[in-house]
Structures are given as C-alpha cells and as structure tokens.
Amino acid sequence: MTNIRKTHPLFKIVSHSFIDLPAPSNISAWWNFGSLLGLCLAIQILTGLFLAMHYTSDTMTAFSSVSHICRDVNYGWLIRYMHANGASMFFICLFLHVGRGLYYGSYTYLETWNIGVILLFAVMATAFMGYVLPWGQMSFWGATVITNLLSAIPYIGTTLVEWIWGGFSVDKATLTRFFAFHFILPFIVAALIMIHLLFLHETGSNNPSGLISDSDKIPFHPYFTIKDILGALLLILILMILVLFMPDLLGDPDNYTPANPLNTPPHIKPEWYFLFAYAILRSIPNKLGGVLALIFSILILMLFPLLHMSKQRSMTFRPLSQCLFWVLVADLLALTWIGGQPVEYPFIIIGQLASILYFSIILLMIPTVSLIENKLLKW
C-alpha cells in the first residue's frame, strides 16, 4: 500500500514542502531564520488573538484595557509581553534573514526576493499599527507624526491624511480602524508567506557557496527539521529571557503614560526596529524628500538584483564585497542609534553622513567593488 503521505492531496503538499523537500547539504545556521520567522508569526497571531479577547479599541478605555490585561487577566502580563517582545524577535529574525539574502546573493531568485520585500513592508505596517493600540503617549504621537508624513504628497496629501485619521486628528476612528487592520494584516502576511515559499520551492534553496547544488541534495526531514527545532528552542529561550527578566528593555517609558493630545513628549520616536529608517527620514530637511528617502531606504532592496555586477553569486569568496557588507551593517547600527537621539548637534550631521553612506554603499560602492573583483579574478 502506497504511503498516504505521498498520495493524500493535503498531506502531499506538506510532504513536498517539509519532508521530502531536497535541500542543499551545506546550508548553514543562517538558513534557519525562515522557519524562525514562521514561528514568530505563529506566536504573534496566538498571543494577539488572546489579547484581542480583552482589549477594547476605544480612546477612553484602550489604555485601561491593556492595564487590565496585565493586572487582572490570568497570565495576561505574560501574553502581553510575549506579544510586545515577540515583535522585537520577529524583526531581529527579519533583519538577519534579509542580511543573509544580501550576503549570499539569494536575491537572484527574483520572485521570492520581491515577495519578501513586500512581506517586509506588510510586517512593518502591522507593527506600526500595533504600537498605536495601547494608546500611550508614544502610541498617540507616533501615529500622529508618521501618518502626518503623507501630507507631504502634493495636492492630495492633506485630504489623504484626514481620510486615514477618519477626522481632523488621530482619535477614536483612527484607533478603531488601526485595530481592525492590525488584526487582519498578519493573516495577509501568512498568505504572502505561502506565495514566498511557493516561489522558493520552484528553484530550491540557495547555499553558502552560491553554486548550483543539484548534485548534492539531502531530504529536509530529518536533517533540517531537527536543525530548525534547535533554532526554535534558542529563539524561545531568548524571547522568554526578555519577557520574564526585562520585558520593558526594548519599550519606551512614555508609553506607560496615557495618550494626551495636549502634551507632546520631548522626543518622539518609533520602536527600535524602525529607528534606522526614522534616522534617514530626519536627515533630510525637506518633508517630501524625507518621506521619499524613508520609502526608498526599504524599497532599495528590490534594486539589488539589478545592481549585482559580480560573476559570482555569493560573497563567500569576495573579501572586498564582504568588507563593504559589514560596513553597511555597522552603518545601519549607527542609523538605529541616531534615530533614538534628539535632533541636535552632533547627531544631525552624523545621521546625514550615515544616510549618505547607506545609499552610497548600496548604489555605488558594492557594484563598483564587484566589477573590480571580476577584474582581479581575470575572468
């Protein structure tokens, strides 16, 4: 009798995706982050569902409902902090996953890469709207500042902002719709992940050498299932250390003050994972220019396949490109730091230099160095 796993229409899909999938034998721990992102999404959807059972999306009661979850709901504090810190873990995994793709040239799988960039935007939108829901000071002012950026769009800007707000300021209508969108978006993200995997399985995974690995494939199960379980355990360990020992480490103290439209916090800043983009936005004095730079700082990822000049796919055997890659990483860390600093000397000029360096490395330096490496190889 043929194995049901290979004949049943539903089990067959699972089997082809997670059991019999031919995977390169040499993929390193950097290939673990895809499954970890799936785990993060599952944690976020589950904890979010339980939070939504007790949360009220009304300006009068939102803040106190979150307080009620933490004080009165059984293990509500645990669910709330798992959700908040789970978002941070999600973005850490996202950045490492994207970084892996850049380093090893995975962006040459065009469809997979572009869907991935769309996924990044979707997750960022979800996280932004989620940050507004507790209705603390930083929630309110963060929502006001970021949505207000759309007013930089010529002609339709102001109308667009008021349409998104559902009034003339961030208020009850804004909070209600943000809650609705925050609830639905993770499921859209899950659907996009399916498409992401569909395209990935058309080509198969890349590997650290960047070479075709058809001659040396091994089954996904048991080799990579056990490897993914190890990664998952480490992720959960780090998450639970964060949640149980330092739940507010990555949060903002201002968000423990209820939203007050009459009192602006001294330093308005988003969550830590948006700070690099926020620093790029602030480094340009012009409003529209800043918004365009902000969008392009993420959208630039889509240009990587076009800017790939090297005759090799991966950076494994390209030491000059490796140096530039790590300079880019350092630059992003510098931007993240600057994004959290007040707008004053010397932070303004550091932010501007870091922003220029960010775009220069990607648009100019990496392609140029790739061409030099081609020459050095005498190919």
Curated annotation (Swiss-Prot):
Cofactor: how bound: Binds 2 heme b groups non-covalently.
Named cofactor requirement(s): heme b
Binding site for heme b b566: 97, 196
Biological processes, Gene Ontology terms: mitochondrial electron transport, ubiquinol to cytochrome c
Gene Ontology CC: mitochondrial inner membrane; respiratory chain complex III
Transmembrane segments: 33-53, 77-98, 113-133, 178-198, 226-246, 288-308, 320-340, 347-367
Free-text function comment from the UniProt entry: Component of the ubiquinol-cytochrome c reductase complex (complex III or cytochrome b-c1 complex) that is part of the mitochondrial respiratory chain. The b-c1 complex mediates electron transfer from ubiquinol to cytochrome c. Contributes to the generation of a proton gradient across the mitochondrial membrane that is then used for ATP synthesis.
Family affiliation: Belongs to the cytochrome b family.
Protein name: Cytochrome b
Organism the protein comes from: Notocitellus adocetus (Tropical ground squirrel)
Phylogenetic lineage: Eukaryota, Metazoa, Chordata, Craniata, Vertebrata
